[in-house]
Amino acid sequence: MTRKELVPILPKNAHDVAGAEKIIALGYPTIAPVMRDLLNLMRVYNSPVADLIAEYFGSLGRFIADDLTKALSKENCGIRHRILTITIPRWSAIEIEQLQICLSCIATQPDANDNDILALSIIQQFNLAEEKWIKKWTAFKRERWSARNMKLKQLEK
């Protein structure tokens, strides 16, 4: 199917579960032309459609590694969180290895959803970096949190 044929089938909003199920039922690679649209739907907070798509992407693994790398590289911590907590845990170790560079970048960039810590955890779990590197970043994050906590305490006075 073409993108033009697939777009009308896409979920209409964040709660259109029937629409999400319909597009997912078409399967991959049929839905490849609207992959970007599906990834964009995953940005919405508290969305059953986003969760359903994230779960489905978990079953696709290596077929969508490049698409997920692009999505993880964006500045949207919501989509990152959904991919790190719903999609990636369904992948095999070999499939997760494809995201090593992207996960390492996320691990060094704190955000509102603590995706950096999630990425560090995945990196450690699948041995994607040297333990020395992980410990160095963990120590750095603790130091920064300590400084932030002191500033927050000053604001509370």
Predicted regions and their residues:
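Short amphipathic alpha-helical patches
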Residues: R62-A65, N76-R80, S92-E95, F126-E130, ...
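Eukaryotic acidic, Ser/Thr-rich intrinsically disordered low-complexity regions
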Residues: T2-R3, Q100-K157
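Structural detector for internal amphipathic alpha-helices that build alpha-solenoid repeat scaffolds
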Residues: P8, H15-P29, N40, P48-L60, ...
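Amphipathic alpha-helical scaffolding segments comprising HEAT/armadillo-like alpha-solenoid repeats
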Residues: M1-P8, P29-L41, R62-L72, A93-A107, ...
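Short inter-helical turns and helix N-cap capping residues of alpha-solenoid HEAT/ARM repeat scaffolds
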Residues: Y45-N46, E75-C77, P110-A112, W145
